[in-house]
Amino acid sequence: MRSAFILALGLITASADALVTRGAIEACLSAAGVPIDIPGTADYERDVEPFNIRLPYIPTAIAQTQTTAHIQSAVQCAKKLNLKVSAKSGGHSYASFGFGGENGHLMVQLDRMIDVISYNDKTGIAHVEPGARLGHLATVLNDKYGRAISHGTCPGVGISGHFAHGGFGFSSHMHGLAVDSVVGVTVVLADGRIVEASATENADLFWGIKGAGSNFGIVAVWKLATFPAPKVLTRFGVTLNWKNKTSALKGIEAVEDYARWVAPREVNFRIGDYGAGNPGIEGLYYGTPEQWRAAFQPLLDTLPAGYVVNPTTSLNWIESVLSYSNFDHVDFITPQPVENFYAKSLTLKSIKGDAVKNFVDYYFDVSNKVKDRFWFYQLDVHGGKNSQVTKVTNAETAYPHRDKLWLIQFYDRYDNNQTYPETSFKFLDGWVNSVTKALPKSDWGMYINYADPRMDRDYATKVYYGENLARLQKLKAKFDPTDRFYYPQAVRPVK
């Protein structure tokens, strides 16, 4: 009885402390003129719902920022009251890191800041607010200026998390990662200062922002180099019909050889299977269907027999964004529908030898027997001789995977009205482990935009940032020594 009473008293005290903290932070925000989300309102209910409903967290308060000054004041209030701060742009983090990955943060909700502030038609540089989502930014740049940037395929993803950690999509082989378009930023630091960062100003901070940006501050303005929106693209697909392990092994190895040595910049593609047991190739080609067929024929000539080339579709830029969005529109200014899932990733220099054998064995022997929910894998061609991603070295930005040919996403989803079972984590864990055990540690990593929150902080930052981790730890100690922008897989400050 006594222990139960002490436990209950502790819970009451903790709850009271949380209320006091919430009252204090909301009072500070209000005094500074920062809009806040009030519990029970529609805004609060929208902003507190995570994309991955498996990982709900409750912030101490939500600052609904609408200006750079609001962001600055929010960080200053958090510093004053010794609260951790997390910035949420689109809210699409697989690990709910926009909430802080735990309860009790001050959440800076950025998605009321969605404007393209300015565009310079001489330089092609656009200044963009941090809460815009990819589809909205693509729509505005295309419709108003006839311009584009390289980015991922999910239109509801916020630009800030996407850009800050790389940003891969069906334009990356042609135009590089989303982060490669970043030429400057306006950042609110942990001490509340507002600074500019670029290749010539605060260059060390700029380096860290380009690949590990969530660790150092909140970007209030992204300055992006755009390119002319393409007028002719081709959506293509190939049904592979791999009926046995031998054909799958030969097929993946054929794709690897083509991707590494032959595939021109214009070919952006992946192998994917969406739980049906029949993988295919899908992608975008920057040019006409006839040009795609000529460019892709060397791969078709080496694939195992039985494949079927699907009809192609000619698209303009914004149609191509819509084509792979899985929605009927792309101009998202509110969150995407929620899901209930666990995901993992790999970045690989190669998937030949025992690595591909283990991948295929697991696919046929384990994965294809999982029939009670939706799962998928995507083997994206990330690097290769002609990939624009590899034209930048690992040392030039904080993004450390440019020497990797493959970016793989593994995704396991239950219905939203179900509970993701503890016993199901072993499905993807086992698949990833089957591959990595066959490779030296230097030949693989993981991608934080497909975050796996079950990894501890030190292991996660090692696989996310690889050879750049030590430099990032020193930058963290310089710009955020008290870990104000902490989340469970944030870089540690180490002097």
From Swiss-Prot:
Named cofactor requirement(s): FAD
Catalytic reactions of this protein: beta-D-glucose + O2 = D-glucono-1,5-lactone + H2O2; D-galactose + O2 = D-galactono-1,5-lactone + H2O2; D-cellobiose + O2 = D-cellobiono-1,5-lactone + H2O2; beta-lactose + O2 = lactobiono-1,5-lactone + H2O2
pH dependence: Optimum pH is 5-7.
EC class: oxidoreductase
InterPro entries for this protein: BBE, FAD-bd_PCMH, FAD-bd_PCMH-like_sf, FAD-bd_PCMH_sub2, FAD-linked_Oxidoreductase, Oxid_FAD_bind_N
Keyword Ribosomal protein among UniProt keywords: no
EC number of this enzyme: 1.1.3.-, 1.1.3.5
Cross-link position per record: 6-(S-cysteinyl)-8alpha-(pros-histidyl)-FAD (His-Cys): H92-C154
Keyword Flavoprotein: yes
Predominant subcellular localization, coarse grouping: secreted
Binding note for cofactor: Binds 1 FAD per subunit in a bicovalent manner.
Glycan attachment points: N244, N417
One GO CC term, this protein: extracellular region
GO molecular function: beta-D-glucose oxidase activity; FAD binding; metal ion binding
Keywords (A to Z) from UniProt: FAD, Flavoprotein, Glycoprotein, Metal-binding, Nucleotide-binding, Oxidoreductase, Secreted, Signal, Zinc
Protein origin, superkingdom: Eukaryota
Temperature-activity note from the record: Optimum temperature is 50 degrees Celsius.
Signal peptide: 1-22
Cellular compartments annotated: Secreted
Modified how: The FAD cofactor is bound via a bicovalent 6-S-cysteinyl, 8alpha-N1-histidyl FAD linkage.
Domain FAD-binding PCMH-type: 55-229
PANTHER family for this protein: BINDING OXIDOREDUCTASE, PUTATIVE (AFU_ORTHOLOGUE AFUA_1G17690)-RELATED, FAD-BINDING PCMH-TYPE DOMAIN-CONTAINING PROTEIN
Family the entry assigns: Belongs to the oxygen-dependent FAD-linked oxidoreductase family.
Main function: Catalyzes the selective oxidation of C1 hydroxyl moieties on mono-, oligo- and polysaccharides with concomitant reduction of molecular oxygen to hydrogen peroxide. This results in the formation of the corresponding lactones, which typically undergo spontaneous hydrolysis. Carbohydrate oxidase is able to oxidize a variety of substrates including D-glucose, D-galactose, D-xylose, D-maltose, D-cellobiose, and lactose.
Protein name: Carbohydrate oxidase
Natural source organism: Microdochium nivale (Pink snow mold)
Classification of source organism: Eukaryota, Fungi, Dikarya, Ascomycota, Pezizomycotina
